[in-house]
Amino acid sequence: MTWTTPDLCDRYPEVTIAEPPFRHFGGRTVFCGPMVTVRCFEDNSRMRELAATPGDARVLVVDGQGSLKHALLGDQIAANAVANGWAGVLIHGGVRDVEMLASLPLGVLALAACPRRTERRDLGDVDVPVSFAGVPFVPGHWLYADANGVLVSPQPLSLDGASGSI
């Protein structure tokens, strides 16, 4: 690893830091990329569609409005995201199939696990600004995540020499 979020925060004090309710569920704990956003409530239809498209090392940021009644991500959509080159997923909501998620080379951050699958009603909005955890998540802005936390920046940050402070 060539960078950590603490080092990026030291180097770029203007970045925005997400409040820390998120847990790592994926096989990758360090990931970054430009954001694609989804706003949905207990319906992962848009997530399923996006995971089937080329990810190009982007990060899917999902505002599930904090609901933990239904998991928005499980092993099938996550495996599709891996196969299509997504770097990671940040979910303001729940996930399931946690043992399988942990075995996949995908960053997955969410609030908690929930065994109940989503209801598919073909609802949700893509590429709209969303806000949760005290942070505005804007399509095309960059997300950086590791075991220390999540930060966002309007532009990509130079990662060269970002490690090594403190």
UniProtKB/Swiss-Prot annotation:
It catalyses: 4-hydroxy-4-methyl-2-oxoglutarate = 2 pyruvate; oxaloacetate + H(+) = pyruvate + CO2. Substrate binds at residues 74-77, 96. Its EC number is 4.1.3.17, 4.1.1.112. Pfam families: RraA-like. Its cofactor is a divalent metal cation. Homotrimer. PANTHER family: 4-HYDROXY-4-METHYL-2-OXOGLUTARATE ALDOLASE 3-RELATED, REGULATOR OF RIBONUCLEASE ACTIVITY A. This is Putative 4-hydroxy-4-methyl-2-oxoglutarate aldolase. The keyword Lyase applies.
